[in-house]
């Protein structure tokens, strides 16, 4: 009576043993293999199928026969000449490839001339993970992820004011002390002088006096004058810029000639110089010489052909 409980315990341990598991990620390749225990008998055929009722392949040496829409492009048989191991590789894993795969060996005895066939099968569970890291990689690396813990009580967290963490600092207004320093620059408006050559009238637009701001006992003055002369050939505008240094030198120079006023005079400006006329004459002469050369060459060719034609007619 004591043997029965022990036998039941052994049977329960055998059937309670989990299958070997292989965990892979989607898109990877999974290699499954089985080793047979009976190494004395002769292997007639090996087979692979997927539970519950899906036959994958039957293999006898290098001859492989696929079933249930499986192909060698999806599942390859990798041990055609090995009698001890049968191996397959499932390529480009998808979620549908997960499940329990069973390998089977069909063997006959090499010593007896009987037709008895022995049978061995082994199961392997394939897990296809959708995460970026597979379970087997986590186990092999030995890394564990523990959740973060907090020593604060829930009521402390509820009463905690989040606004105390993020304080918005209001910047102080930026004031500029006007009394301490003042940066100013004095500008003098342009003085535009327009002289009409045809009518002989001269008009001058004068601007208000410059505004001077004292800071370091110096004044920066830039004077820009424009003079527009209207002539029969067009309008000529000249620009002259005078700074403080030039004014100072002009004031101290005894040889400075005061400006003169133009009135009632007609100004004629020539845009062409002697050099320009020489270039135009040279280009014209070159064109004429080229035309004469072309004419001479044409006349010579025509005259030569005419003589040749006359000679042929005489003959």
Swiss-Prot record:
Record's GO cellular component terms: host cell membrane; membrane; viral envelope; virion membrane
Pfam families: V-set
PROSITE patterns referenced in this protein's UniProt entry, alphabetically: IG_LIKE (PS50835)
Glycosylation site list: 37, 69, 112, 161, 254
Regions of this protein lying in the Virion surface compartment: 17-279
Domain Ig-like V-type, first and last residues per copy: 17-121
Protein name: Protein OPG185
